Amino acid sequence: MRRPAIALVVILLGLGLITGGLAWLLDSPKPPAGASHVERLYLGLCATCHGADGRGSWRAALFLIRPGKLAEAARGEHTEQYRFDIVKGGGAPLGRPGMPAFGASLSDDDIRTLVAYIQNLGRMAASGRAGS
């Protein structure tokens, strides 16, 4: 009776690894030719979960993570400082444990530039231009 349970656990773990690996590799947003520094930062660090247009990504859902849809007009409720803090220190201190911290890999200037880019995604969504 113990062997079937172990086999089931091994199979489920294997399927999880395969599914997770494929989700990570497939449809990963790539910066277009001539992309700005901030576009490369966003697409390289944020788009995997938040989507290239800030509307969320199916990849995050596979891991049962519900990242914020940055392009939604309702996201405008957060201040620039809140966004800076969550990008720099991660979401755990602010009640968003799925959000990783980027303070060790990004300068404060890069984080500020990224925050401005993210805020612009929200403005474009509010005006109906996101994704166009």
Task: Please provide the spans of the model-predicted regions.
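Charged catalytic carboxylate motif
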Residues: 41, 82, 110-113
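N-terminal Sec-pathway targeting helices
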Residues: 1-12
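Hydrophobic core
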Residues: 12-18, 54
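The canonical Cys-X-X-Cys-His
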Residues: 42-52, 99, 114-118
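Gly/Gly-Pro-rich "capping" loops immediately C-terminal to redox-active cysteine motifs
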Residues: 39, 51-85, 102
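Soluble non-cytosolic domains of exported or imported proteins
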Residues: 36, 77, 105-109
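Axial heme c-ligation environment in periplasmic c-type cytochrome domains
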Residues: 64-69, 88-122, 126-132
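Electrostatic cytochrome c docking/interface patches
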Residues: 16-43, 128-132
